[in-house]
Amino acid sequence: GTVWESANIGANQQLGNLCAIVDWNQSAAQLMPVDDLSGKWESFGWDVSVIDGHSQSELESFFSNLDFDIHSKPKVLLAKNIKGKGVSITEGHGAWHHKTPNDEEFEIIKKELSL
């Protein structure tokens, strides 16, 4: 689709100042698995970094070390994470991708996130 067409263009045009961020929460993989996502981006000519998308220190390290040399490859950050992490009723449950909490659920969410 359009993502892979864009990935191809980014590498072919040598857009070294381009950085894509993939919210890799595995929700789409349940419907259409992608084998070796890192290898797929590499095959398009991108520099790939994989981090724990829940780790503030890994995110800060990635962005502070990011080099936007226009003569280098474009970069992609695969941020592995779990949808709804940190809340018992939402963590890993795909329905929360589009669901609105009712009042009771909202109170549970606020309590578990210390809000």
Regions found by a protein language model. Give the residues of each.
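Glycine-rich ThDP/TPP pyrophosphate-binding loop and its adjacent helix/strand module
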Residues: 1-115
